[in-house]
Amino acid sequence: MSDTVDRLRAALANRYTIERELGAGGMATVYLAHDLRHDRQVALKVLRQELTAALGAERFHREIQIAAKLQHPNILPLLDSGEAGGLLFYAMPYVEGQSLRERLAREGALPVPDTVRILRDVLDALTEAHSHGVVHRDIKPENIMLRGRHALVTDFGVAKAVSEATGRQTLTTAGVALGTPAYMAPEQASADPHLDHRVDIYAVGAVAYELLTGRPVFMGTTPQMVLSAHVTEAPQPITRFREAVPRALEALVMRCLAKQPADRW
């Protein structure tokens, strides 16, 4: 980690001051940094070395610049991106709040009104992105930030670039790296190269299921078992785990989780 930080500090010395590590996932390490040009704090996300090698700077910039054009109150905007010290990075506003994953870890299943409000914000963000032809491909609680009563979706453009760079033959590895098996649509899990906005609808359904029940749609001892379940198994009814969930809401979530994309909302 220190080697990476040293390389970043040296390469970005005139643009950012790296303050501390905020967290690390399968795809990137996130640092709190100070934007020297604009005197503001940002979240600087640095892709893992192997993903940087697989992507290449040109493809990364192409995909992330498409996403950078998105402007919406529920989309965390892209502020900057580039290559530094042989590493690919992008910067977003630093959100004083928590991720949806952090809230789930602390509280488990959320109240129905909170769940509906969060989902409405996420769907508003996705509607805007989809209207511009941008598919997220990696909707999950880690990529939903909570600020006050509002939810913001992060990391548009990154998942598409990574999944295309890693290729179909390494989809399972890519899925693990992205941390998405629990939210992958069947067509993603099956390595279908022709994905569209309906993979995001499925992922929202998977997130909604977890918000309402406190557990993922499918669980398994390996990522491959979870991916297989998305393709072949029917989800348990939400009301099996939480009887008080309105039936209309349960029906909506289950329709989002339809195996066939044409059957989703």
Which residues fall in each region the model found?
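Conserved short submotifs of the Hanks-type protein kinase catalytic core
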Residues: G85-S99, R103
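Conserved N-lobe loop of protein kinases adjacent to the ATP-binding glycine-rich P-loop
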Residues: H34-Q41
